[in-house]
Amino acid sequence: MSEPELQLVARRIRSFPDFPIPGVLFRDISPLLKDPDSFRASIRLLASHLKSLHGGKIDYIAGLDSRGFLFGPSLAQELGVGCVLIRKRGKLPGPTLSASYALEYGKAELEIQKDALEPGQRVVIVDDLLATGGTMCAACELLNQLRAEVVECVSLVELTSLKGRERLGPIPFFSLLQYD
């Protein structure tokens, strides 16, 4: 991994204390998205990691609603593969499958179109940030329902103190930046 590129990415993540509620330190990726060099570096770094581990053995990138959509298509293009969308409930037309995940107060659902993938296709799930792992686990469940193979989950940022990586069990996980 290129240290100068990683530093370019890291410098574009800013922190907002007590947002959206007191006690939360919000990691904002907006400056990264505004800077084409930093954004390109983030895509190159994620793609380089995936190429080194999986070579040409990835069929699709699955982007998670909503900020995973910012990285999914660009990462897919860099790897020369397609991108599928995993959306919040009620946002996809046609027949869908759904999986629930817990929120701090209640639950939410993700959906994928039933014909998004074929059994056995190898998929990498991407999101901007991994916190508790609830969303990523629900996405893995959806892909398992389609009998696709989740080869890895990746994110730009990981909040290590929330232990989301542990919830993924045996599924490999990679993040460019880690914060407590």
From Swiss-Prot:
Its EC number is 2.4.2.7. Signal peptide: none annotated. Keywords: Acetylation, Cytoplasm, Glycosyltransferase, Phosphoprotein, Purine salvage, Transferase. It is found in: Cytoplasm. The modification Phosphothreonine is found at residue 135. The gene is APRT. InterPro entries: Ade_phspho_trans, PRibTrfase_dom, PRTase-like, UPRTase/APRTase. Catalyzes a salvage reaction resulting in the formation of AMP, that is energically less costly than de novo synthesis. It holds the Pfam family Pribosyltran. It comes from Mastomys natalensis. Belongs to the purine/pyrimidine phosphoribosyltransferase family. This is Adenine phosphoribosyltransferase. Pathway: Purine metabolism; AMP biosynthesis via salvage pathway; AMP from adenine: step 1/1. The keyword tRNA processing does not apply. One of its GO terms (cellular component) is cytoplasm. The keyword Transferase applies.
